[in-house]
Swiss-Prot record:
PROSITE patterns membership: ATPASE_DELTA
The keyword Thylakoid belongs to this UniProt entry's keyword annotation: no
NCBIfam families in the record: ATP_synt_delta, PRK05758.2-2
UniProtKB keywords: ATP synthesis, Cell inner membrane, Cell membrane, CF(1), Hydrogen ion transport, Ion transport, Membrane, Transport
Major localization listed first in the record, in broad terms: membrane
One Gene Ontology cellular component: proton-transporting ATP synthase complex
Gene3D superfamilies: N-terminal domain of the delta subunit of the F1F0-ATP synthase
Lineage: Bacteria, Pseudomonadati, Pseudomonadota, Gammaproteobacteria, Chromatiales
Role according to the record: F(1)F(0) ATP synthase produces ATP from ADP in the presence of a proton or sodium gradient. F-type ATPases consist of two structural domains, F(1) containing the extramembraneous catalytic core and F(0) containing the membrane proton channel, linked together by a central stalk and a peripheral stalk. During catalysis, ATP synthesis in the catalytic domain of F(1) is coupled via a rotary mechanism of the central stalk subunits to proton translocation. This protein is part of the stalk that links CF(0) to CF(1). It either transmits conformational changes from CF(0) to CF(1) or is implicated in proton conduction.
Originating gene: atpH
GO MF, any single term: proton-transporting ATP synthase activity, rotational mechanism
Lineage top rank: taxon: Bacteria
Protein name stated in the entry: ATP synthase subunit delta
Membrane topology: Peripheral membrane protein
Length: 179
């Protein structure tokens, strides 16, 4: 995973440096998300790694699946470049890194909130408000549930992790009692 990130980062940065305004960033987000989704498909990933499938066939497959209108000439150029360098398998990682760069530039932090039960809109707003105040940036919440947490929530924003789950509290209590 770390190796893929290292290989994908220069491509994501290069694409990001092409974008000068929000409209262009949004266009590239759509392009990269579409390409990343197609490239992440198990069947497509198997073809990308198959030496019997030519570079031209892979390019054609991606262009057909995503649509040349969606990609535009710059998107086609990226696909060609990645194919030439044997890096089409990096598309999902490139898309993720691009979104991270975009969020940073726009002063937004993506936050993963995992809770034991579904959060209400009011709870989501309360968490977002508290995190915005603490981090000093706009917050974009991504919520999911995991009943294994028993209660509470686990919040992850970049390197920051706040474990307010019952499972986490029990683990810390158990660890403290063992020492």
């Amino acid at each position: 995973m770390a190796e893929q990130t290292t290989l994908a980062r220069p491509y994501a940065k290069a694409v990001f440096e092409l974008t000068k305004d929000a409209k262009t960033r949004n266009t590239w987000s759509k392009r990269l998300q579409a390409l990343g989704t197609v490239a992440a498909d198990d069947q497509v990933a198997a073809l990308v790694g198959n030496p019997r499938v030519s570079r031209e066939q892979l390019i054609g497959l991606l262009l057909d699946a995503v649509g040349e209108d969606t990609l535009g000439q710059e998107g086609k150029n990226l696909v060609q470049l990645l194919a030439d360098n044997g890096r089409l398998g990096l598309l999902p990682e490139i898309a993720a890194l691009y979104e991270h760069l975009r969020a940073e530039a726009e002063g937004v932090v993506d936050v993963q909130v995992t809770s034991a039960s579904k959060l209400t809109k009011e709870q989501q707003d309360q968490i977002a408000g508290a995190l915005k105040k603490r981090l000093g940036r706009k917050v974009r919440l991504h919520c999911r549930t995991d009943e294994a947490l028993i209660g509470g929530a686990l919040i992850q924003a970049g390197d920051l992790t706040i474990d307010g789950s019952v499972r986490g509290k029990l683990a810390r209590l158990s660890s403290a009692m063992a020492h």
